Every structure is written in C-alpha cells, then in structure tokens.
Amino acid sequence: MTEQEIFEKVKAVIADKLQVEPEKVTLEARFIEDLGADSLDTVELIMGLEDEFGLEISDEEAEKIRTVKDAVEYIKAKLG
C-alpha cells in the first residue's frame, strides 16, 4: 500500500470520526488544535484506524500520533 493510499484511508476515517470535511484533513493537520478533536475523539480515532488497517496501536504509541502525518507514517511503518 502506498503512502497516498494510506493517507486516503486515514483521511476517510478522520473525516468520519471527527465529523469534519475531508478537505480539512491535510497531512499537517493536528487532531486537537486543527480538527477540533477532544481526548475521547482521539481514542475513537485510534480505534477506527486500528479497525481500518487491522493494527493494534498501544496507548503509548497512540499518544505520539498527534497529526495526520504522524498517523500515516506510523501505519506505513507498521504495514511496511
């Protein structure tokens, strides 16, 4: 799976979970500051990414995922 394909899937999960327009989901976007997520939203977001990609993301690793780019790079490394 290419980085672009991962980004498209991540974008869809984020847009759905955070109820934001897909155009607002850029690589630079921060979940809390830019996309309006709260701590519960971020937990649901991580769970959505786990389901979408068939991964398990530990709480420690999840805390490091703060931007869309963080999520894409993490998933790419895990799938790699």
From Swiss-Prot:
GO terms for biological process: lipid A biosynthetic process. It is found in: Cytoplasm. Its main location: cytoplasm. Residues 4-79 form the Carrier domain. GO terms for cellular component: cytosol; membrane. The modification O-(pantetheine 4'-phosphoryl)serine is found at residue 39. 4'-phosphopantetheine is transferred from CoA to a specific serine of apo-ACP by AcpS. This modification is essential for activity because fatty acids are bound in thioester linkage to the sulfhydryl of the prosthetic group. Pathway: Lipid metabolism; fatty acid biosynthesis. Signal peptide: none annotated. InterPro entries: ACP (IPR003231), ACP-like_sf (IPR036736), PP-bd_ACP (IPR009081), Ppantetheine_attach_site (IPR006162). Keywords: Cytoplasm, Fatty acid biosynthesis, Fatty acid metabolism, Lipid biosynthesis, Lipid metabolism, Phosphopantetheine, Phosphoprotein. Carrier of the growing fatty acid chain in fatty acid biosynthesis. PANTHER family: ACYL CARRIER PROTEIN, CARRIER DOMAIN-CONTAINING PROTEIN. Belongs to the acyl carrier protein (ACP) family. HAMAP family: Acyl_carrier. This is Acyl carrier protein. The lineage of its organism: Bacteria, Thermotogati, Deinococcota, Deinococci, Thermales. The gene is acpP.
